[in-house]
Amino acid sequence: MRLNTLSPAAGSKSAAKRVGRGIGSGTGKTCGRGHKGQKSRSGGGVRIGFEGGQMPLKIRLPKFGFTSRKAMVSAEVRISELAKVNGDVVDLSTLKDANLVTRNIQFAKIVLSGTIERPVTVKGLKVTKGARAAIEAAGGKIEE
């Protein structure tokens, strides 16, 4: 072992650099902030997206789109999740009881993702073509 081969242990963390502790430390006096200016001051700095008073890009570009209110009360349920439903009938209330959708959901759609082993009867839910084929192949049925 020699002095030039010594190194910190693997995974160890070096101590935080202490600023304002003299010229020899490398971060004395101005503490790495330079001279004057907004960024050198306490609490200095500009908000995200600020462009120095120029009209920001976010405001220069036109508005577009909207948030569908129906999307907030709609949900998709995977076909593999239907195994968590107790009983043979799957409707909105049984999906809520099985915690597959939240209480505020009013519309649900069953999509093909995964597999289903047992036959179930789907009532009052939308079903994709692939999910419909998989449910019927497992011996289940869909009632509108």
From Swiss-Prot:
TM helices/strands, residue ranges: none
Region (Disordered): 1-48
GO cellular component: cytosolic large ribosomal subunit
PROSITE patterns: RIBOSOMAL_L15 (PS00475)
Record flagged with keyword Repressor: no
Keywords: Ribonucleoprotein, Ribosomal protein, RNA-binding, rRNA-binding
SUPFAM superfamilies, sorted: Ribosomal proteins L15p and L18e
GO biological process, one term: translation
InterPro entries, per the entry: Ribosomal_uL15 (IPR030878), Ribosomal_uL15/eL18 (IPR021131), Ribosomal_uL15/eL18_sf (IPR036227), Ribosomal_uL15_bac-type (IPR005749), Ribosomal_uL15_CS (IPR001196)
Biased composition (Gly residues): 21-31
Pfam families xrefs: Ribosomal_L27A
MF (Gene Ontology): rRNA binding; structural constituent of ribosome
Family of this protein: Belongs to the universal ribosomal protein uL15 family.
Role according to the record: Binds to the 23S rRNA.
Subunit structure as annotated in this protein's UniProt entry: Part of the 50S ribosomal subunit.
HAMAP family: Ribosomal_uL15
Protein name in the entry: Large ribosomal subunit protein uL15
Protein source organism: Shewanella woodyi (strain ATCC 51908 / MS32)
